[in-house]
């Protein structure tokens, strides 16, 4: 009986106070936080360069990035943020087939439904993060079969632009 109540007490404590980490894990987390601002600044600078490089490509119908003057909330972004952030969305002509072809042609950028890594990651929201929504609801939200979301990492922006440009060239052929 005492064992059972102690066990439930531990569960209650974890549910209401969260898990506890080891001292080493805390130290690693602290070391990462010390450079977080520098990393996000660099990633945001790269994201803006990449977003600009995607504008006007014949296979892309739109580039969605709040750091671009063409974004409908650009002024709000300037008021609330120092930079436009690390995530770019862009819409490919050709739908899901084009989106998957582009993702599979990338060499540096990883395919994943995660965000915010030191490595650049691309995802297809319609089949990952938003797959449970109805097609009508996805359409209302602007999540089409051609939409890709790129979370920019710490790689050199020129290398990422080259990787994306190469994958886009493969679509045109």
Predicted feature descriptions by range:
Residues 28-38, 86-93, 149-153:
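Short, well-ordered beta-strand elements within core beta-sheets of diverse protein domains
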Residues 6, 29, 123-124:
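Short beta-strand-to-turn element immediately C-terminal to the catalytic PLP-Schiff-base lysine
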Residues 18-51:
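A conserved active-site cap/scaffold subdomain adjacent to cofactor or substrate pockets
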Residues 21-25, 79-83, 140-145:
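Short, flexible turn/loop "capping" segments at secondary-structure junctions
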Residues 1-12:
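Single conserved hydrophobic/aromatic residue that forms the stacking wall/gate
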Residues 48-117, 133-139:
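Conserved small-domain helix->loop->beta segment predominantly found in fold-type I
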Residues 39, 120-173:
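PLP-dependent enzyme catalytic core of the Aspartate aminotransferase-like
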